[in-house]
A protein has these predicted regions:
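NUDIX/MutT-family hydrolases
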Residues: 100-102, 110-143
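Conserved hydrophobic "DFG−1" position in protein kinase catalytic cores
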Residues: 28-29, 37, 103, 120
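Active-site-adjacent beta-strand/loop module that shapes the phosphate/pyrophosphate-binding cleft
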Residues: 85-109
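Residue-level preference for beta-strand/loop junctions
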Residues: 6, 20, 45, 77, ...
């Protein structure tokens, strides 16, 4: 999808394209295999993996470590790329493409920034609602493979 932009000074016209927004999500598991989730402060309201938008000039790995720290206070020791999810319907706000990382982290989770709560939950007993496609991502991680679709 595009629309035309016209410079108000010189009259030059160019196309502006809507593009997907790049995001990252962190899957952090404790020694019992429970998954870290945050309760979101902003819509869509519900529970989600820690994560967010990649800043200009930032690597995916740095972005996931930053978002994890901002939302939970945890520090990433190591990050391993798991899969990239790109279903245009995965985020009700706009088309996002999210790279998911398995993260080994230190510290105790404490809600900050966009999170009002943070805690670990068994993958088979997640709180409701889990927003975006994060329940699917968690299932993919638990089963060690990605289900069909994007």
């Amino acid at each position: 999808m595009s629309d035309r932009l016209t410079c108000p000074h010189c009259g030059h016209t160019l196309d502006r394209y809507d593009q997907p927004r790049l995001t990252v999500d962190a899957v952090v598991r404790n020694d019992d295999g429970d998954v870290l989730l945050i309760k979101r402060r902003n819509p869509p309201l519900g529970w989600a993996l820690p994560g967010g938008f990649v800043d200009v000039g930032e690597t995916l790995e740095r972005a996931v470590a930053r978002e994890l720290n901002e939302e939970t206070g945890l520090s990433a020791r190591s990050v391993t790329q798991f899969h990239t999810y790109s279903d245009p319907a995965r985020d009700p706000r706009h088309h996002t493409v999210s790279t998911v990382f398995l993260v080994d982290a230190t510290g105790e989770p404490e809600a900050n920034d966009d999170a009002i709560l943070a805690g670990y939950f068994p993958p088979d007993a997640l709180p409701a609602p889990v927003v975006f496609d994060h329940a699917r991502i968690i299932a993919d991680v638990v089963h060690g493979h990605v289900t069909s679709g994007g």
